[in-house]
Amino acid sequence: MLKRLLATTALAVSVLPLCAAPVSVEGFTHVKSLGGIDEYRLDANGLQILLMPDHSAPVVTFMVTYRVGSRNEVTGTTGATHLLEHLMFKGSPAFNRAKGNSIDQFLESIGAQYNATTWLDRTNYYAELGSEHLEGYVAIEADRMRNLWLHEDDRRPEMTVVRNEFEIGENNPQEALDKEIFAAAFQAHPYHHPTIGWRSDIEKVSIEKLREFYDTFYWPDNATATIIGDFDPAQALGLVKKYYGAYPKAPHPIPQVYTEEPEQTGPRRVMVQRAGELGYVGISYKSPAATHPDTPALNVLALILGDGKTSRFYRALTDKNLTTNASAQAGFFHDPSLFQIYAGLAPGARHEDVEKTILDEIERVKKDGVTDAEVAAAIAKNRASTAYARDGSFAIASVINECIAAGDWTLYLTYDEAVEKVTAADVKRVANHYLDHNKSTTGWFVPIVAPAATK
């Protein structure tokens, strides 16, 4: 999930390599170049390719982002995207453990760092490896796009792994509360469903359904291949053509999510009561998609309200000994999502006191606004955190991955240019527009103390 990983254009330009002219390779269309990144399309099937050479170290990251996440699931298949992500490592007729050339065996033998992740709007697969091994990884990654084995004998044990992850989340107070808040806030839109899925769907989804899901979304024209680091652009495009070029476009239109969440007309509340030690309060408000022009100002608002010990929430709550931590986060997703606030209760604190303190601080911002100094400090925080988050080819690819998922990879370069232009007036305006009590969902995590064992 993107957590303020985007940097300012000015900063990005300072750390990017000098831009070279895009290369011309038969079978590709050059789409555009921006900030040291060249975008191409593979003519045979519509695969999007992003190239960003950087020869500062002999390392390259290859990442494939599929535009499918939990927003593409329905009741009965929730968690399918994530379970399929696990099964993508089980091999194919060409690359498998019996042959000694599975993706795990290859990448571990060369010391690569690799993994895959699933989120609301996307699934990604990646490896950071020595430049000389790029072709070997591209070959395996391309192969599993269309030739994956999907066997029931693999589904059953992998399902138990995913179910264990589900149970770990259930035992985390903030994660458990967050799931309930999303489910209450989104009644129609599929952001209602947790990315890991509902337990019964995790346990019961069939291998046939997973195959159907794979055959629906895992196609070149629903994917982006991003290559960042030490490579030659013409040679890299040659590898993409060699290993992806034989695949056709999807034989059907990729299904699009068209469900829109109806306007919320009143506040909603949820309560989670289960074993635990400390309570939580969460308050979320409907917020726009990542590409909306108000999102940068909401990001600045979140930094002012809930980022660090100098933030308004932290100071207001700790002055009253009410909290151990407080945070605010502006949503950065493909569709309208949530502006989220969380506070962990200090021992002895009451939920209602924490909630009231948060709401009072929000009303203060809506009425009186914020200072120019607060805005400047928030922008500086955003700039600095981005610099730390873009350390290396994998870190950069990860940020671009979230921008692809949000609907536009160029947000990697343009988003923080907009953040730099946010004013105190902008922050006050978005606070009044979006932090609307009638569009809020409030949740309490109330720990239940287990009774003492009797002798």
Where are these regions (language model features)?
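Active/ligand-binding-proximal structured segments within catalytic/core domains
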Residues: 55-104, 293-305, 312-315
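Charge-rich, well-structured scaffold segments of protease-associated domains
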Residues: 2, 10, 43-44, 101-253, ...
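Residues that act as N-cap/strand-start positions at coil-to-secondary-structure junctions
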Residues: 33-36, 266, 426
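Structural beta-strand/beta-sheet cores of well-ordered domains, especially the beta-sheet scaffolds
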Residues: 38, 60-62, 79, 85, ...
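Mature N-terminal segment immediately following signal peptide/propeptide cleavage
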Residues: 25-66
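Bacterial N-terminal signal peptides
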Residues: 7-17
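His/Glu-based metal-binding/catalytic segments typifying zinc-dependent metallopeptidases
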Residues: 167, 183, 252-310
